[in-house]
Amino acid sequence: MADKLTRVAIVNSDKCKPKKCRQECKKSCPVVRSGKLCIEVTPESRIAFISEQLCIGCGICPKRCPFGAITIINLPTNLESMITHRYAANSFKLHRLPMPRPGSVLGLVGTNGIGKSTALKILSGKLKPNLGRYDNPPDWEEVIKYFRGSELQNYFTKILEDDLRAVVKPQYVDQIPKAVRTPDKTVKFLIESRKSMDNLDEVLDTLELRHIYDRDVTHLSGGELQRFAIGTVCVQKADVYMFDEPSSYLDVKQRLAAARIIRSLLRPDDYVIVVEHDLSVLDYLSDYVCVLYGQPAVYGVVTLPHSVREGINIFLDGHIPTENLRFREESLTFRMVEGTEDFVAEKSRAFKYPAMEKTLGNFKLRVDAGSFSDSEIIVMMGENGTGKTTFCRLLAGVLKPDGTTRVPEMRISMKPQTITPKFEGTVRQLFFKKIKAAFLSPQFQTDVVKPLKLDDFIDQEVKNLSGGELQRVAIVLALGIPADIYVIDEPSAYLDSEQRIVASRVIKRFIMHAKKTAFIVEHDFIMATYLADRVIVFDGKPGIDAHANKPESLLTGCNTFLKNLDVTFRRDPTNFRPRINKLNSQLDQEQKLSGNYFFLEEGPDKEKERS
């Protein structure tokens, strides 16, 4: 009987439509044919119900379902006794829980839809874990008894006695203005009304909130809202601080400032938990890491805590040595050379753009003349408000430079920074309307559409898509339009760590095959260095006076950029991902003295010599 219980049957409530099909799942099920009620569904029922006890895991119904609504998975038997929470019959379930430790930062890493936000809800006391018994949930005594002997026992006892005050920074900061109900909506009022610690000045200075202090929340940009949300959490006195994706919308400098202010909250008796997809920031922030693996929207499993380096490497490698389990087919690495070996591109055509200036209100951007060739990706690095998007629009011809300077006309396809879905209809209809030729080409399907896994939601309404799904649709739309230059503004926003690496591979391969040029704005440093052939560094005063340098090689460009930020990076010897050095550590001081803020390639032997 034990192995029978290890099936997970998931019915997707958005896709399952019993009124529109002939109940193929029920008719094809061998258990139903033998007279047992394994699948129960009538045209009147809202969704099909599959009994996991009776299911034999034959895998026929997922193939027969015309809407692709059923997923059947066989789980390792030892997991069955560790269910922490399940929402309903045939729905997502979470196994185990991350274990927060007082006085240290716990990082959670895993793909979207694998239970990180569910784990945060449980740990913040908003959701009571039902241990998989969704029909008769256990009371708190049983829950605490279940977790006895682990660090979670004391934690839940405190939650039960109302001893734990948890503050959460939400994932979607763009929804904050709608949630503010007070008549006074200024940043000053909202922060000061919640203030219960005396670190207000430090928070305002580190997060650069002074110049927006008197502004209305409804007038803030994405990055300003993010810093406001982090600041609001940091001035409150609490026992548990939770940050759900604190780095989206922020540039590299602000990400590190946010990381420093989050680490400053640590006291011997409080807990800090962070969910983050930018792996270099997660690495810098956390003291230890829990990896979540499984299948998105089906089940999620939390691993035991690992050290930061080991945890992130396990996630990238796709293999957990302690459980001897592989949860992803291929491992993800960051060799700079791997991209260039596959594609030896003939750089036949060169484009030039002139030196130009552009004034927008009080903001002035000066651009040095530069040139670029086809099959090349140029990444723009700089703080928010230094004119990267303005430069994209100058290239695209949307804005005209000051004076008589003219940019040569080129066909340009652009993916904007913010995506607002206005299209009425499904994703497939949108593609057929905008990029029919590309969408029907087999090369485009294998290079772009398949790796980004658009088939999962291709027949859903565009308006109902999540942030990450919209982002992938926007990338496909931008690449599908025939053009000389592709301008992609922040392709990593809303994507999880795995999708970011896939997206950067897709963009890189597409640009090489199509022999075109791409200009990319990207703040995730790992993704930016993976993509870039050359770099344009933007410096100056954000929002006032900025300067775009001419395109430089990746090494010199990153060194210039990091020198402005006063940050150094080293490389991990196993998978070559860039890692931030702790401020004033020995490596940090050595690299600053020698002027090497960033390494292109560093073998394991060099790393050993150093250590």
Swiss-Prot record:
InterPro entries: 4Fe4S_Fe-S-bd, AAA+_ATPase, ABC_transporter-like_ATP-bd, ABC_transporter-like_CS, P-loop_NTPase, RLI1, RLI_dom_1, RNaseL-inhib-like_metal-bd_dom
Pfam families referenced in this protein's UniProt entry, alphabetically: ABC_tran, Fer4, Fer4_RLI
Domain 4Fe-4S ferredoxin-type: 7-31, 46-75
Location of the ABC transporter domain: 77-318, 345-565
Single GO biological process annotation from the record: rRNA processing
Gene Ontology CC terms: cytoplasm; nucleus
Residues the entry annotates as binding ATP: 110-117, 382-389
Keywords: 4Fe-4S, ATP-binding, Cytoplasm, Initiation factor, Iron, Iron-sulfur, Metal-binding, Nucleotide-binding, Nucleus, Protein biosynthesis, Repeat, Ribosome biogenesis, rRNA processing, Transport
Protein localization: Cytoplasm; Nucleus
Disulfide bonds: none
Molecular-function GO terms, alphabetical: 4 iron, 4 sulfur cluster binding; ATP binding; ATP hydrolysis activity; metal ion binding; translation initiation factor activity
Family, similarity comment: Belongs to the ABC transporter superfamily. ABCE family.
Role: Component of the multifactor complex (MFC) involved in translation initiation. Required for the binding of MFC to the 40S ribosome. Required for the processing and nuclear export of the 60S and 40S ribosomal subunits.
Quaternary structure and partners: Component of the multifactor complex (MFC). The complex associates with pre-initiation complexes.
NCBIfam families cross-referenced by the UniProt entry: PRK13409.1 (NF009945)
Protein name, as recorded: Translation initiation factor RLI1
Organism: Chaetomium thermophilum (strain DSM 1495 / CBS 144.50 / IMI 039719) (Thermochaetoides thermophila)
Gene name, Swiss-Prot/TrEMBL: RLI1
